[in-house]
Amino acid sequence: MATIKDVAKMAGVSTTTVSHVINKTRFVAKDTEEAVLSAIKQLNYSPSAVARSLKVNTTKSIGMIVTTSEAPYFAEIIHSVEEHCYRQGYSLFCVTHKMDPEKVKNHLEMLAKKRVDGLLVMCSEYTQDSLDLLSSFSTIPMVVMDWGPNANTDVIDDHSFDGGYLATKHLIECGHKKIGIICGELNKTTARTRYEGFEKAMEEAKLTINPSWVLEGAFEPEDGYECMNRLLTQEKLPTALFCCNDVMALGAISALTEKGLRVPEDMSIIGYDDIHASRFYAPPLTTIHQSKLRLGRQAINILLERITHKDEGVQQYSRIDITPELIIRKSVKSIL
């Protein structure tokens, strides 16, 4: 592997001159600069990122800590963040923790050692212990995104109440009166607010919520599958079902299909999130759209602003608003 000394020798200059060319820290004559760049290319020389960061005080890298990269919703946000980082000239180090405090601590220490310029932390829920841990790394510019009503973080307001209302309202407008729901864990903010939107739409339409048709999952496809199988053991079934995310809808559709039932002929289903794959479900899923692209872009823009102004004291917490939109496809039928 070539070193800076090899480059200097080939170009016929000092290592200091090579450093100035690489870091653009001092004027270098054009012919000298060209000789150095030619030597770098011929030797396939790559400067030490750590050594360079010590000189210019930046690694042009960002760390991201996220609950999981497996869930399609989070995977699409990560993709958006990575794309926007790349356009801004930054590399992204992404790690997952699955709500394990020890892993979070280890990841934070590792990213700090890599001298990342900033940190983006995106989890579905935070404990006070995890917030205290993050505060111990406060010297690193950081954006901590929270879907909950936390006063000590930046906030993602995805207007889940409005989205839950919008989904249920669409089912009602299609003539459905017997409506069930597979929600997330109701002790979690996102799940609870989507359910409250469902309640509001049902109340406005003067429709009764059947407690037997309210099932809790954990936003995974197997939860949709298991909840639908429990629902199908009942004597009376809803004509429509609101699944509070798209992957639970996928699991629910799979369970229905295994029993020889069809969507939407035997039961209409609406999802939530509008993940990329939802348009390729059988049938294509009617759902509630949330802009993952906009969320990722705004989160990084806030972080880059904090990196730029990191020496100016405490930054105000920010808020990102994501407006839900109804996407009509083929999984809901009108029974008017």
Swiss-Prot record:
One of its GO terms (biological process) is negative regulation of DNA-templated transcription. One of its GO terms (molecular function) is transcription cis-regulatory region binding. InterPro entries: HTH_LacI, LacI/GalR-like_sensor, Lambda_DNA-bd_dom_sf, Peripla_BP_I, Tscrpt_reg_HTH_PurR. SUPFAM superfamilies: lambda repressor-like DNA-binding domains, Periplasmic binding protein-like I. Keywords: DNA-binding, Purine biosynthesis, Repressor, Transcription, Transcription regulation. Residues 4-23, 48-56 bind DNA. Gene3D superfamilies: 3.40.50.2300, lambda repressor-like DNA-binding domains. Hypoxanthine binds at residues 73, 188, 190, 219, 273. The keyword Metal-binding does not apply. It holds the Pfam family Peripla_BP_3. Pathway: Purine metabolism; purine nucleotide biosynthesis [regulation]. HAMAP family: HTH_type_PurR. PANTHER family: HTH-TYPE TRANSCRIPTIONAL REPRESSOR PURR-RELATED, LACI-RELATED TRANSCRIPTIONAL REPRESSOR. Homodimer. Is the main repressor of the genes involved in the de novo synthesis of purine nucleotides, regulating purB, purC, purEK, purF, purHD, purL, purMN and guaBA expression. PurR is allosterically activated to bind its cognate DNA by binding the purine corepressors, hypoxanthine or guanine, thereby effecting transcription repression. This is HTH-type transcriptional repressor PurR. It comes from Haemophilus influenzae (strain ATCC 51907 / DSM 11121 / KW20 / Rd).
